[in-house]
């Protein structure tokens, strides 16, 4: 039974997911259905946490929109996600960047890593 579930989950996993790190600035394109229309929506922000659990892996992206912090959790292997693009590589010393929630302005900046 366990092998059956494992095989099914492996078939469902996406192969083209980039290797994300906390502190990276990413652009996530997702499909949004509004009424009868289907369109791509872009969410760009900093990866503040990553949870690696096989098919159930997820990552949290945070951005500041109109002065308010917005966080969104994406399932890595979701069929709703069209593309994940890394815009900038960040240098941080923590695995979870939850402390960014209480920072704003220049103190919330993350150093840029030049080579991936």
UniProtKB/Swiss-Prot annotation:
It holds the Pfam family Ribosomal_L19. Signal peptide: none annotated. Keywords: Ribonucleoprotein, Ribosomal protein. One of its GO terms (biological process) is translation. GO terms for molecular function: structural constituent of ribosome. One of its GO terms (cellular component) is cytosolic large ribosomal subunit. InterPro entries: Ribosomal_bL19 (IPR001857), Ribosomal_bL19_CS (IPR018257), Ribosomal_bL19_sf (IPR038657), Translation_prot_SH3-like_sf (IPR008991). It comes from the Bacteria. Belongs to the bacterial ribosomal protein bL19 family. This protein is located at the 30S-50S ribosomal subunit interface and may play a role in the structure and function of the aminoacyl-tRNA binding site. HAMAP family: Ribosomal_bL19. This is Large ribosomal subunit protein bL19. It comes from Blochmanniella pennsylvanica (strain BPEN).
